[in-house]
Amino acid sequence: MNFGKVIQVIGPVVDIQFPPGQLPEIYNAIKIRSADQENYQGSFEIDITLEAAQHLGNNAVRCVAMSSTDGLMRGMKALDTGAPISVPVGAEILGRMFNVLGDPIDEAGQVAAKEVWPIHRKAPTFENLEPSTEVLETGIKVIDLLAPYAKGGKVGLFGGAGVGKTVLIQELINNIAMEYSGYSVFAGVGERTREGNDLYNEFKESGILKNVAMVFGQMNEPPGARMRVALSGLVMAEYFRDVQNQDVLLFIDNIFRFTQAGSEVSALLGRMPSAVGYQPTLSTEMGQLQERITSTKNGSITSVQAIYVPADDLTDPAPATAFAHLDATTVLSRAIAELGIYPAVDPLDSTSRILDPHVVGDEHYSVARGVQKILQRYKELQDIIAILGMDELSEDDKIVVARARKIQRFLSQPFHVAEAFTGTPGKFVPLKESIRGFKEILEGKHDDLPESAFYMVGTIEEAVAKAKEMA
């Protein structure tokens, strides 16, 4: 038993001194429990897990706490467990909800997992990687057409506060996880507890909870938990990929909070802050997480990550660092949300690696580029319209504007998960239908219909039917 003693507590960071030659390794889990203390007089029980982060010299280590450090005192005994934080993995974790340490938090008893894995692991080697070019159909028109997702790829949903990231990730869970019979892992990183609770209950009601493992480290938890909970969720997904050779879905909401937690402890660990006050190790930390979320020859991890954009600034170091790791980026725009168009995806800012004629086919590619071309032209004409009005445009430009406004509205779509709020039933639009609908608008087949007929419908037939009702 390797015991040390607490010599300093600074919020979530604790310094512990060990006997000479018995320093715990970096990333080892260290436990402080009231049961280990001699004549402990505190009013409540203490059971805190910390992670060794730095060796300070003088036989001391600086650790980051995974739960609140309330009640800690100098001189308390701390036990080096001799291993990193480890969480349960395998089929037994499905249908359950965990915290960062892998302890169940759904009040459904202990988890009888046969194996536990450490949360820190190496990324797969280069020769084991398996690039993918198969399109993952989401049933959301704007995504499938303009920034399609790859099976086994990494997707980022970027957006400021309140533009619909969480609703979009819930719709993707609804459309992909419900259609798809495999396993999913959901990691709630530093987001609202209420949303996690709602999601758990939705999974329960819809009957897909038996195929989902959930891990939460929410907003109210100390930065240590928020910094490591993404790794706890990831290791559960890695087990399904590497040992069971499954194709797994990994949902993370929100990657920005992972970076934010790192920056909260960075200064306490004595590092010099870098740009905008972030930790100097920002890109390393992001890389260590993202490089593990990948598809190998054994199985794949398809990941969807919501990424908060502080003050709507995509050049902020946190979202900017995440961009480099993704196969597809879906950018949510406040300007589009203000028009009442949901999902508020920016069709000109969102990108995908697989929007390529060799992957999606010539028809899909030409329709997608045609839609973007018209929307781009409309964007350029907006200044002229604002100053001189529509009448000053040429006949061709008037047609472009009319079609662009129809396309803009046709990119909106009612969601299943928002049905309770909007009263409109959600729509799943197959990719073929999306391509056909936009192709018809581009060809001018629906120039006679009012633009409001295209708002919040599924397929093009619904828009035509809506126009007839309005007439």
From Swiss-Prot:
It catalyses: ATP + H2O + 4 H(+)(in) = ADP + phosphate + 5 H(+)(out). SMART domains: AAA. GO terms for cellular component: plasma membrane; proton-transporting ATP synthase complex. The keyword Cytoplasm does not apply. It holds the Pfam family ATP-synt_ab. CDD domains: ATP-synt_F1_beta_C, ATP-synt_F1_beta_N, F1-ATPase_beta_CD. It is found in: Cell membrane. It is an enzyme of class 7 (translocase). ATP binds at G159, G160, A161, G162, V163, G164, K165, T166. Keywords: ATP synthesis, ATP-binding, Cell membrane, CF(1), Hydrogen ion transport, Ion transport, Membrane, Nucleotide-binding, Translocase, Transport. The keyword ATP-binding applies. F-type ATPases have 2 components, CF(1) - the catalytic core - and CF(0) - the membrane proton channel. CF(1) has five subunits: alpha(3), beta(3), gamma(1), delta(1), epsilon(1). CF(0) has four main subunits: a(1), b(1), b'(1) and c(9-12). Produces ATP from ADP in the presence of a proton gradient across the membrane. The catalytic sites are hosted primarily by the beta subunits. This is ATP synthase subunit beta. The gene is atpD.
